[in-house]
Amino acid sequence: MRVLVIGDIIRDRYVYGSTERLNPEGGAVPLVRQTYEETKLGGAALVWDNLTNLGVDCDIVEYDKRFQDVKTRIISDGHYICRVDSGFGDVAVYLAGEEVYNKVKAIDFSRYSYCILSDYDKGALTYSKEIIKLANAAGCKVIVDPKGTYERYVGAWLIKPNKLEANKFNYNDIDNINTITTNAESPVVARIDGVTYLLPVDPVEVADVTGAGDCFLAAFVYGLTKGYDYRKCLEIAVRGASTAVQHRGTYVLEPEDVEQKIIFTNGCFDILHRGHIEYLESSKKLGTKLVIGLNSDDSVKRLKGESRPINNQEDRQRALQSLRFVDEVVIFDEDTPYNLIKQINPDIITKGGDYKPEDVIGNDVADIVILPYKENYSTTNIVSKL
């Protein structure tokens, strides 16, 4: 699938330095001694940069740099001192809109599955309604990151306002279109094709919120191009935005930031010992999420005999959940975890010891990685000493 990005291109300029004294010229303001500076893409360009870096076939409508806003942030010793915005006022807004629309009229929208309108109200999307009509006529779905009232985006397939922007909308007007409402401190609320989704946002240490919305949008559209269902697209978007805010300055997502690589392993884990812990830690290093299939008490008895397990399934599950590198522990009652493996659909299944990959249950579902067990550590040996 191919994506087109149209919108306000912003250049985010960061000036870094240190402060040791106040400005001797007065005003009780800090004197910043510059050490270095960098310029990053922002606005519509950041959406395009993220999508491209995630491997999406993506184009952007460029326009004269003279009409693009530059946001300069002065940062001293890790703290923002001020932000200076530069542009050319109403003239630039007018000229940007005219140039973008003239270019858009020559675009064959049938080449694109999705068109993203990234609106920062800087003029590039002056003709947003006309652009949406052109895209719709070619069967291209329009997704809008808005900066204004609904009337500017009539006909869009989906609108992604933040909470403040959503309050400006009359929901009687947008009742028949898809929406995603984001807010840093609240769950993401989405309504797509008549289904409502509510996704929690896990707390993270926030370094900078600049560009988080652009990363969210890019990650969501990335999911669409991969053919994922809407819930998974939203989960990816939340994950992408959460990753972005943990970095200073605008951040460009890497594939590993949005795609989870699920690792699965299974066992009884009756008496948790060092061998287990090192094996599980090695398993987690192969991906981003470690899921353990834990044999139920009845399953353990069938495998190990009536004297086992020593610890019941709830205690064994809780012990595994306490390990920082374990993400999920699922109890299964069958003799093998095959049905659970098919349900989870992991990328990798790990097994310890001298197994051959072709003998491991689930080898038809995922790749198999055999990890060495730590010598002289086993539950059987521990039990024999009791």
Q: Which residues does each PLM region occupy?
A:
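Short, conserved phosphate/pyrophosphate- and ester-handling motifs at nucleotide-, phospho-/glycolipid
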Residues: 162, 213-214, 273
